[in-house]
């Protein structure tokens, strides 16, 4: 696997879930797998759970782990292409990526949407540059449009607790004081569709997600109606592109 950024990258989903559950039952059965291997975790944005859980997972596999908070404790990096570098950013990301790749075996990247231009966000410029230029397998620890690690964990939780083969899963928009990006709901929708659950999305009008993530899900603006008969409810806030 050269990259893990979306559900399609994981291959056979049922097999992936089964293997994840097997590892969960005995977290230390593959401690030799990562011997003499190094994971580099790069954070362009803050993280708590993803940072800790990913680092712990790598340690369980016997890997060495390096963590870099970009623009904090390292040179500020310019991520836009074609700009004049006469500001406070000392190095361009394209120059730094091969250097980073030379010191590790796997790279995890966390880079949020700027939420100013949807088309630009959906290009996933930062993540894609690592995939193209690092020479290493790259996985997303949340990007502009998806959060595959969280969605995989959500799917595993549903599989562990479901009482019927094809449960009804409802993702409902919830209020939040801050404007949150769409990566988590996009990704959750993608994974629920891939799992072929009875999947419903409910939100106020104007908060529609991109059709490529909604997929085969039913969209119901009436929250009460959407929640009827739900086996699992996933509450998440997201902002709308204006």
Segment roles from a protein language model:
Residues 44-67, 159-236, 241:
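Glycine-rich phosphate/diphosphate-binding loop of Rossmann-like nucleotide-binding domains
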Residues 10-14, 91-94, 125, 212, ...:
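Generic alpha-helical secondary structure signal
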Residues 1-52, 56:
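Positively charged, low-complexity intrinsically disordered leader regions
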Residues 34-41, 47-159:
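Phosphate/diphosphate ligand-binding glycine-rich loop within oxidoreductases
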């Amino acid at each position: 696997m050269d990259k893990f950024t979306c559900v399609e990258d994981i291959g056979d989903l049922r097999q992936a879930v089964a293997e994840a559950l097997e590892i969960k039952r005995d977290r230390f059965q593959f401690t030799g797998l990562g011997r003499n291997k190094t994971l580099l975790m790069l954070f362009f944005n803050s993280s708590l759970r993803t940072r800790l859980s990913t680092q712990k997972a790598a340690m369980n596999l016997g890997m060495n782990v390096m963590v870099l908070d970009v623009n904090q404790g390292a040179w500020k990096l310019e991520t836009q292409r074609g700009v004049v570098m006469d500001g406070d950013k000392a190095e361009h990301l394209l120059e730094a990526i091969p250097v980073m790749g030379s010191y590790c075996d796997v790279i995890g990247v966390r880079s949020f949407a700027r939420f100013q231009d949807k088309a630009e966000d959906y290009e996933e410029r930062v993540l894609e540059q690592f995939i193209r230029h690092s020479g290493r397998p790259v996985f997303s620890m949340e990007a502009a449009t998806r959060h595959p690690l969280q969605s995989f964990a959500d799917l595993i939780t549903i599989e562990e607790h479901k009482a019927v083969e094809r449960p009804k899963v409802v993702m409902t928009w919830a209020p939040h004081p801050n404007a949150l990006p769409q990566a988590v709901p996009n990704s959750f929708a993608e994974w629920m569709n891939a799992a072929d659950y009875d999947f419903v999305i409910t939100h106020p009008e104007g908060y529609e997600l991109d059709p490529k993530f909604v997929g085969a899900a039913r969209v119901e603006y009436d929250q009460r109606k959407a929640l009827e008969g739900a086996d699992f409810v996933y509450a998440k806030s997201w902002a709308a592109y204006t």
